[in-house]
């Protein structure tokens, strides 16, 4: 079940948004890292 009291707290929304943003940035960095390595692999 969803705890609606947690969703009413704006700080929790900020935490969720930050987590999603960090996860997206990390995924992008990983993709770029392996993409460059694949192209310039020796």
Curated annotation (Swiss-Prot):
Transmembrane among the record's keywords? yes
What is said about its interaction partners and assembly? Heterodimer of P20 and P22; further multimerizes as hexamers of heterodimers. Part of the dodecameric portal complex that is composed of the packaging efficiency factor P6, the DNA packaging ATPase P9, and the internal heterododecamer P20/P22 which spans the virion inner membrane.
The molecule here is called Packaging protein P20
Q: Which GO terms describe its cellular component?
A: membrane; viral inner membrane; virion membrane
Q: What biological function has been recorded for the protein in this entry?
A: Together with P22, forms the internal part of the portal complex embeded in the virion internal membrane and which plays critical roles in genome packaging and genome ejection. Both proteins multimerize as a single ring-shaped heterdodecamer arranged around a central channel and interact with the P6/P9 external part of the portal.
Keyword Chloroplast assigned to the entry: answer is no
Major subcellular location class: virion
Question: Where does the record say this protein resides?
Answer: Virion membrane
Q: Write out the entry's keywords from A to Z.
A: Capsid inner membrane protein, Membrane, Transmembrane, Transmembrane helix, Viral genome packaging, Viral release from host cell, Virion
Q: How does it sit in the membrane?
A: Single-pass membrane protein
Residue intervals passing through the bilayer: 11-31
């Amino acid at each position: 079940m969803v705890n609606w009291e947690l969703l009413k707290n704006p700080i929790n929304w900020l935490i969720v948004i930050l987590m999603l943003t960090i996860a997206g940035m990390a995924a992008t960095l990983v993709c770029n890292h392996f993409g460059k390595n694949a192209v310039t692999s020796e």
